[in-house]
Amino acid sequence: GRVELSLKLLDAAVLDGVRRAEGAASGRAIPVLVFGAGHTGRAIALALQPLPFHVTVVDTRPQLLAELPPGIDSRAMPLPEQAVAAAPAQAAFLVVTHDHALDFHIATAALARADAAYVGMIGSATKRARFHRHLAEAGLEGQAARLHLPIGGNQVRDKRPEVIAAMVAAELLVHFMGTDVENPMHRLCTCP
């Protein structure tokens, strides 16, 4: 037999993708921090709970965190953006708080982390434009492309928390476990 070996230099984006795929394939739970324990944050946490994610809900309001079902970790923090700094590498950050200014602080902190695997925020086109201006003012305009806004995409126009949660769960599964058919690293065989 004959073995062919090919070596290529990988850029940081490809390497991050390989690391995410390796983590998903190994069965390790992917850390997901949901910022906001309101209706949408709760629905997202419930949708992600049975999936291969380790969900932690972070909020400034301990009374809302107390209403979460067992099995979902929670953290009451007066400055939720501090949870971003303490999160493990390759974590996903979902920002769905009740306060736009707080959303901006949390998302900016998450985007400042080069090892953040996913950063998403709930919002409209107007919120997206405001956040892009905010990033430009902070000197982080290059990070805007990494932000998923609105989380879950905009293919379904339904604002019910459970629908948003289903779309977010699907988006995270594709992001972390999907395959890119154009990427030769994912083509192991050609099937008839």
Residue ranges and their predicted role:
Residues 122-192:
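Adenosine-phosphate binding glycine-rich loop
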Residues 69-78:
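Active-site regions of enzymes building and remodeling cell-envelope glycoconjugates
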Residues 45-47, 69-70, 105-108, 132-134:
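Short amphipathic alpha-helical segments
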Residues 38-39, 101, 126:
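Residue-level detector of alpha-helix initiation sites
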Residues 80-89:
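Short amphipathic alpha-helix with an adjacent loop that forms part of the alpha/beta core around
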Residues 31, 91-93, 118:
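Structural motif
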